Amino acid sequence: METMRAQRLQPGVGTSGRGTLRALRPGVTGAAAATATPPAGPPPAPPPPAPPPPPLLLSGAPGLPLPPGAAGSPAVLREAVEAVVRSFAKHTQGYGRVNVVEALQEFWQMKQSRGADLKNGALVVYEMVPSNSPPYVCYVTLPGGSCFGSFQFCPTKAEARRSAAKIALMNSVFNEHPSRRITDEFIEKSVSEALASFNGNREEADNPNTGIGAFRFMLESNKGKSMLEFQELMTVFQLLHWNGSLKAMRERQCSRQEVLAHYSHRALDDDIRHQMALDWVSREQSVPGALSRELASTERELDEARLAGKELRFHKEKKDILVLAAGQLGNMHSSNC
């Protein structure tokens, strides 16, 4: 029985999961994903829209009061980041020039020493995008999995690293504020906003089989966690939706409760990435060009989000999965030659 259940909850789409996929990210209007071969007969009913999650790192400066129309402004974002970095340095290192890379690492080591549950340790990981000329781009992944990137034009690799560290430090500091915790009041406010957005009724919020009910279940299950922690969990479900895996699980008769319970406690790992990459290999074989189109779209989204100072893990995981799929296709072609 458990073996059958585990098989139904696998992230892969399989041959029965092909169809039109929509990259509907929770709370964000997404662009259409790659279109695979449409099934014969009438198209299946689309999945119910996912209700919006709590406000997460919008405009790159969570909780920071910005003037009207300033959200997304590079100048305002840069000013906000510098202000937070200076404030953090003042309280931890005294006045003077800040080594923001060291400050970010020190912040997470301090969290760990105070009892934060960091399953993979407190190490902050940097990744430079290969390039022989500016602008240079750097990504930084925090211990919990959240990802940020250099948000400025960076003429050197060192500057790109500092830029990524600055935006990551700002979000790390803001994430400690009490207003960034999921509380009963926050849950009620978020669910009410979701009901208003989708013209739902209160009964839907209490039924875990509805989209809004599932959203409430997710919030309730993560009460006390921070926005970054919640976003890390939501990334798994965003990827499952983008890849068509949630639709495939419904076709395999998996209930919402089963899916939520299973993936709420499963970290995003190489097995999930590999299975999703295989799905994109299959799509590319059915519809040549689907993979390259989706990769180009994903790279544009990643760059736009990076320059806006937003959390990037969903976009970056998408890109990594698609690059993995392209590599698998290349290996298959080489072996056939």
Swiss-Prot record:
InterPro entries: Autophagy-related_EPG5, LIX1. GO terms for biological process: autophagosome maturation. GO terms for cellular component: cytoplasm. It comes from the Eukaryota. SUPFAM superfamilies: dsRNA-binding domain-like. CDD domains: DSRM_SF. Residues 1-64 are annotated as: Disordered. Residues 26-38 have a biased composition (Low complexity). Belongs to the LIX1 family. This is LIX1-like protein.
